[in-house]
């Protein structure tokens, strides 16, 4: 195989149990987001926009929709050997050594595929999660990794100390070399010179290739290990004196974007997913999809334009402060502060507000829907209300989150 300078490996096998029922039939990275994308698209665009084109995507849990999405819509062609995005399912590649086991953790997923790293002989390996919403110039992080002569560089997100108890926290010296890793500490240690802020690990790493091999081979031999980068590999690297540095995500430059890079969301719960979706519909969104210098590619399904019809009395087709994909028809209804995916139809006299409707949802006449996530292929009968009586919603079998968001599962029949 052809040699590459930087090899990307994306961890996309997560079950995403806290996103159920959205993950009932799909992996977390395959969950739709932002009217036309899937969550995996954002990290893939980060690699491609950063000029890193040799990418493996490691899959495991309910990967069919994710597999189809990448195979159909993320193709470079067959003429450049160092340009590829290839899927790597869990396949017991080390069966003779490990026995009949799938990926046992984030580190083990890479360990079971070290032969792929060996084949390309990269200078550095970028190991990123496939389930976050963010923009990142990964090439800038790689250059920082080279400049510091690091064995490992960890992307870090500054958070208020009061919020840092939810994260793995990195303690650094004045050079931003990591001296300690705290897993969800009760008393997080602040950044030097910034007593109100702590450094949270984003779970994205750049490894010197030789260090990656050494650490993963040692971890695989450790029978007490959970084979996780944050819990096992990074603490081992610190104990054994590896050069481990933090990279300040806020200083990551995005072409076409002014100011610091502030937006990173782990949409690992239904409420977090909903909040990130609502971020998109603000007049000045926290996460801007409209940056021609940082294009966000995804499936091109050749949908027709969105359409708004009727303008008589209360029967007015309109959408306010919303994102609508191709093929949406708002026929005499009102959509407000919502995200509508492909081929959604909102019929006359209905109101949809602060909601997310996946592909092929149809809202009948005189419906009222608020604070809801409705998965694909749901036909809502006329005069139905969702999000107004939470006990009724629970009785229907819908999920109601701690923040009161109602989630209707894929293909639900009223």
UniProtKB/Swiss-Prot annotation:
It catalyses: alpha-D-glucose 1-phosphate + ATP + H(+) = ADP-alpha-D-glucose + diphosphate. The lineage of its organism: Bacteria, Thermotogati, Deinococcota, Deinococci, Thermales. This is Glucose-1-phosphate adenylyltransferase. It comes from Thermus thermophilus (strain ATCC 27634 / DSM 579 / HB8). Alpha-D-glucose 1-phosphate binds at residues 103, 168, 183-184, 201. The keyword Nucleotidyltransferase applies. Its EC number is 2.7.7.27. GO terms for biological process: glycogen biosynthetic process. GO terms for molecular function: ATP binding; glucose-1-phosphate adenylyltransferase activity. InterPro entries: ADP-Glc_PPase, ADP_Glu_pyroP_CS, GlgC_bac, GlmU/GlgC-like_hexapep, NTP_transferase_dom, Nucleotide-diphossugar_trans, Trimer_LpxA-like_sf. Homotetramer. Pathway: Glycan biosynthesis; glycogen biosynthesis. Involved in the biosynthesis of ADP-glucose, a building block required for the elongation reactions to produce glycogen. Catalyzes the reaction between ATP and alpha-D-glucose 1-phosphate (G1P) to produce pyrophosphate and ADP-Glc. Belongs to the bacterial/plant glucose-1-phosphate adenylyltransferase family.
């Amino acid at each position: 195989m052809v040699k590459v300078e930087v090899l990307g490996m994306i961890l996309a096998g997560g079950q995403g149990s806290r996103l159920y029922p959205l993950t009932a039939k799909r992996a977390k990275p395959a969950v739709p987001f932002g009217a036309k994308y899937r969550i995996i698209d954002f990290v893939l665009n980060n690699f491609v926009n950063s000029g890193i084109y040799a990418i493996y995507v490691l899959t495991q849990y309910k990967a069919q929709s994710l597999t189809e999405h990448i195979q159909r819509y993320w193709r470079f062609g067959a003429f450049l050997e160092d340009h590829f995005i290839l899927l790597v399912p869990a396949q017991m590649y080390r069966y003779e050594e490990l026995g009949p086991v799938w990926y046992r953790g984030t580190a083990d997923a890479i360990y079971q595929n070290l032969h792929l790293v060996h084949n390309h002989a990269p200078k550095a390996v970028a190991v990123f999660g496939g389930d976050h919403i963010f923009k990142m110039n990964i090439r800038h992080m790689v250059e920082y990794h080279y400049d510091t002569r690091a064995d490992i560089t960890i992307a870090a997100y500054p958070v208020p100390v009061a919020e840092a108890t939810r994260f793995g926290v990195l303690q650094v010296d004045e050079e931003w070399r990591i001296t300690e890793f705290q897993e969800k500490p009760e008393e997080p240690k602040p950044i030097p010179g910034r007593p109100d802020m702590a450094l949270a690990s984003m779970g994205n790493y750049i490894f010197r290739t030789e260090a990656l091999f050494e650490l993963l081979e040692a971890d695989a031999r450790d029978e007490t290990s959970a084979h996780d980068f944050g819990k096992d590999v990074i603490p081992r690297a610190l104990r054994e004196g590896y050069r481990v540095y933090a990279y300040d995500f806020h200083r990551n430059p995005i072409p076409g974007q002014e100011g610091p890079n502030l937006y990173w969301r782990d949409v690992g719960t239904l409420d977090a997913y909903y909040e990130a979706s609502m971020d998109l519909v603000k007049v000045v969104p926290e996460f801007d999809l409209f940056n021609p210098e940082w294009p966000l590619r995804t499936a091109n399904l050749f949908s027709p334009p969105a359409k708004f019809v009727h303008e008589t009395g209360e029967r007015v087709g309109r959408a306010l402060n919303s994102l609508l994909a191709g093929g949406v028809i708002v026929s005499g209804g009102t959509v407000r502060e919502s995200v509508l995916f492909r081929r959604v139809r909102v019929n006359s006299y209905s109101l949809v507000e602060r909601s997310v409707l996946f592909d092929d949802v149809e809202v009948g006449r005189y419906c009222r829907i608020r604070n809801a996530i409705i998965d694909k292929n749901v036909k809502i009968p006329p005069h139905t209300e969702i999000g107004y009586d939470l006990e009724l919603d629970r009785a229907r079998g819908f999920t109601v989150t701690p923040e009161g968001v109602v989630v209707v599962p894929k293909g639900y029949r009223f």
